[in-house]
Amino acid sequence: MPREHDKQSKFAPSHLGTKPVEYKRNKGKKMHDKSGETPIIMQTKGE
């Protein structure tokens, strides 16, 4: 029955439960500011 095993190895489900954990965690790497400058903070509500 090696044929059925080959089918399973090619199957890649796209629903959220099968995504690797690092896929969810690595957003910080993308959003990280590499310029080294301090961010300009804009006040949206009065304090």
Swiss-Prot record:
Induction of synthesis: Expressed only in the forespore compartment of sporulating cells.
Keywords: Sporulation
GO cellular component, one term: endospore-forming forespore
Parts forming coiled coils: none
Region (Disordered): 1-47
InterPro entries named among the record's database cross-references: SASP_SspN
Location(s) in or outside the cell: Spore core
Keyword ATP-binding tagged: no
Gene Ontology BP, a term: asexual sporulation
Family: Belongs to the SspN family.
The protein, known as: Small, acid-soluble spore protein N
Organism ancestry: Bacteria, Bacillati, Bacillota, Bacilli, Bacillales
